[in-house]
Regions:
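Short, well-structured alpha-helical segments
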Residues: 99, 144-148, 162-170, 190, ...
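Hydrophobic alpha-helical connector segments
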Residues: 71, 82-115, 166-169
């Protein structure tokens, strides 16, 4: 009889932990909005109320500002990774995968300004660098797999290096955090990411792939508009 009781306790603890994580992510989303408006150095109760937060709530769910920032960046990665978890891309055309990811990025990150991330990188550089490395590793692997899939499907050029293209993409993506290249008031993460995807596809596709990309991009644009 001990094992069922232990199982129930373990299950309850697991559900409680997941609930707490979801709550922290919800708060992190609101914190990003707060930081974009008021910065990270001063948490004013009146300003917090405007984004649906309170000082008491923050103290209950976060140990300090580092914990807040770490959760904000973790949630950003989680939202990105969920796209690949929600879609089963097995058997899909490589170009369609790129377009689906671009559309989902646009839907989920349409209002995410690089200005917040730039602020976080300046105040907590070590936390930010850890985030950047984890995000880069994830995107690199997905990009590399896609390029190799597209080559096998006859959509991408056979003489491209999947590793080199993936690394170049990561380098350009990380330029998002350089305000001299992308002024944060003029660009969102989604806009920059999708433009980079567009440039990559145009550079690595062969004639058949370019024709397919043009056709499918128009289709996805119509579906997304609806």
């Amino acid at each position: 009889m001990k094992y069922p009781i232990l199982f129930i306790i373990f299950t309850a603890e697991k559900e409680f932990t997941l609930t707490m994580i979801k709550k922290r992510y919800l708060l992190a989303d609101k914190l990003r909005t707060y930081i974009s408006r008021y910065g990270i150095n001063n948490f004013n109760e009146e300003h917090l109320k405007k984004v649906g937060l309170s000082i008491e709530e923050l103290k209950e769910n976060f140990s300090d500002r580092q914990d807040m920032v770490g959760t904000i960046l973790e949630y950003e990665r989680k939202c990105f990774e969920e796209i690949f978890n929600e879609y089963n891309f097995e058997g899909w055309n490589a170009i369609d995968i790129m377009l689906i990811v671009s559309n989902e990025i646009n839907n989920r990150f349409f209002n995410v300004s690089p200005s917040v991330t730039i602020t976080l990188s300046e105040v907590f550089p070590e936390i930010f660098q850890d985030h950047l490395q984890k995000r880069s590793d994830f995107i690199y692997e997905k990009m590399k797999i896609n390029i190799e899939k597209g080559m096998q499907q006859g959509m991408y050029k056979n003489d491209v290096s999947s590793e080199m293209i993936a690394r170049m993409f990561i380098a350009k993506l990380n330029d998002i955090h350089n305000p001299q290249i992308y002024p944060p008031e003029d660009f969102t993460f989604a806009t920059i990411f999708n433009n980079l995807i567009d440039n990559v596809i145009k550079n690595i596709t062969n004639e058949e792939g370019r024709a397919y990309y043009k056709q499918r991009k128009q289709l996805y644009s119509v579906l997304n508009y609806r």
